[in-house]
Curated annotation (Swiss-Prot):
Belongs to the universal ribosomal protein uL3 family. Gene3D superfamilies: 3.30.160.810, Translation factors (2.40.30.10). PROSITE patterns: RIBOSOMAL_L3. The gene is rplC. It comes from the Bacteria. This is Large ribosomal subunit protein uL3. GO terms for cellular component: cytosolic large ribosomal subunit. One of the primary rRNA binding proteins, it binds directly near the 3'-end of the 23S rRNA, where it nucleates assembly of the 50S subunit. InterPro entries: Ribosomal_uL3, Ribosomal_uL3_bac/org-type, Ribosomal_uL3_CS, Transl_B-barrel_sf. Disulfide bonds: none annotated. Pfam families: Ribosomal_L3 (PF00297).
Length: 210
């Protein structure tokens, strides 16, 4: 039974297991999410549900999106995402999905936007070794040769070079749910997840259950 939620990353902390081991966890506010649309193979070619998260003022939402939301009989939402499922019949438009959809010990995948680091060199961006620090070296953090002059007289695609680091979509797979607070829609997830504090992430069943 697949499921997915939109969540907000609140930060990291640590908890202690019964055997005294310290576990680093990420705290996320998972839901409540409202089902806005149900897609089926018969009507759309695939099975999925569209959910909204965090209420928003109507004036801050585009008119086409506002009309789409009102067709579902709901108010405006700040974030709308779609999750592909194989059993959409379980859901109806207007249903609320909360953090208790997940269980302690369950494994999940978390998708978010990594923290942007700006324009960085090849050492920070790709882990290049760099040149010598002394003995007359004039080559410290430079990328070195990026191709030959005679042939092919061009730079190959995907050559590792300086550029923008971070600020891209990242998925971390097979993270374990350590604790579920259904009253406050809080999930404690073992380990780190991509993104900054208060960033929006997608929490869904892992594609690697074993």
């Amino acid at each position: 039974m697949k499921k997915g939620l939109i969540a907000k990353k609140l930060g990291m902390t640590q908890i202690f297991a019964e055997d005294g081991k310290r576990i680093p966890v990420t705290v996320v506010q998972a839901g409540p999410c409202v089902v806005l649309q149900k897609k089926t193979s018969a009507t759309d070619g695939y099975d999925a549900i569209q959910v909204g998260f965090l209420s928003q003022e109507a004036r801050k939402v585009t008119k086409p999106m506002l009309g789409h939301i009102k067709a579902a009989g709901q108010g405006a939402f700040a974030h709308i995402r779609e999750f592909r499922l194989d059993d959409v019949d379980r859901y109806n438009v207007g249903d609320v999905i909360s953090a208790d959809a997940f269980e302690v010990g369950e494994y999940i995948d978390v998708t978010g936007t990594s923290i942007g680091k700006g324009f960085q060199g090849v050492i920070k961006r790709w882990g290049f070794r760099g040149g010598r620090s002394s003995h007359g070296s004039c080559f410290h953090r430079a990328p070195g040769s990026i191709g030959s002059s005679a042939y092919p007289s061009r730079v190959f695609k995907n050559k590792k070079m300086p550029g923008q680091l971070g600020n891209e979509r990242v998925t971390v797979q097979r993270l374990q749910v350590v604790r579920v607070d259904a009253a406050d829609n809080i999930l404690l997830i073992k380990g780190a997840i991509p993104g900054a504090k208060n960033g929006i992430v997608l929490v869904k069943d892992t594609v690697k259950p074993r």
